[in-house]
Amino acid sequence: MMKKLLLFVMITGIISTAHAQIENPVTWTYTAKKIKGDVYELHMTAALEGKWHIYSQDAGDGPVPTSFEFAKNPLVKPDGKVTEVGKLDKEYDPNFKSTLRFYTGKVDFVQRIKLKSPVNTLVKGKITYMVCNDKKCLPPRDVDFSIKINPKS
């Protein structure tokens, strides 16, 4: 009987640990929108669960800001920097001893690009971000993305 109880406790602990390690309150979606001619907007949208928030690219001192790294693509030229569309919150955080900038609910990160040739291509890259709620922060996370550009459609 004790062996079964011990086994049950161990399995429950392993499952709880595994669940905690894969906690991910962010869902990312990726789309391309043709603006005009050879100009497109890449939309990398973060939807956050509950009271979780994601930090701005200019987060403040302390947390890891959201950042974007685009893979080289000879068919694509970036046009400016990634912009943020959403309700930006600013709040002093005594843990970081800094005023932090973040988004709750949803934020759309937008990168304009120019297509050098009217052919289908993929824009690939990596997003690094960190999320927190009022109780804890999760470690920074990297997410790879791939966005289809189809100028003929």
What are these regions (language model features)?
Residues H19-S153:
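Extracellular/lumen-exposed scaffold segments
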Residues K4-I14:
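Sec-dependent N-terminal signal peptides
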